[in-house]
Amino acid sequence: SGVPRVLIDEQAKTYVEYSSKIVFEPVNDGKEIVWMSERDGWCHLYLYDGVKGAVKSQITKGDWAVRNVINVDPRRREIIFSANGMRPGEDPYFVHYYRINFDGSGLVALTDAPATHTVKFSPDYSVYVDTWSRVDMAPVSQLRKTSDGAVLMELERASTDALVAAG
């Protein structure tokens, strides 16, 4: 009809900051929408019916937060995203990267070192460079496969030995 209408209406009794969290990824010619929401108290991904505006399923769930959506692949029905707080016993502020199917199955950790990761993907998302570090650890860069997170090769490992020796 060409008449605009509300598909998704988010309301909360508490303050919700969305300025840096807006994820609205239409897929399947707009018949579905990947949407980021804090509706369960944590920042997670949901699959919406793009025609009716109803939640079809919650893609991610748990006591952890999705930070950012990196890529939505409608053909493979996969999402690559960053998150924090997912790994028990680890600093909850460390950022890790994951891949998951639209139906919430097949979660694959793409990063594993207990550190904050910065990832740069190849244009086809088949491989990526994972650079990770902590305040007590110099950066390490590795080339990895997106299919399973396997390390293909270490690219670089910084060393602070000379600085520590110099005092």
Question: Model segments located where?
Answer:
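Beta-strand C-termini and the immediately following turn/loop, strongest in propeller blades
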Residues: 1, 23-40, 49, 59-60, ...
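Short, flexible loop/turn elements at secondary-structure junctions
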Residues: 11, 37-39, 49-52, 63, ...
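Repetitive beta-architecture junctions, highlighting loop-to-beta-strand starts
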Residues: 2, 31, 43-45, 54, ...
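Non-catalytic accessory segments flanking enzyme active sites
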Residues: 1-13, 17-23, 36, 68-72, ...
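Solvent-exposed strand-loop boundary residues in beta-sheet-rich modules
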Residues: 51, 101-103, 147
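Polyanionic (Asp/Glu-rich) segments that form extended negatively charged tracts
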Residues: 5-6, 44-51, 55-61
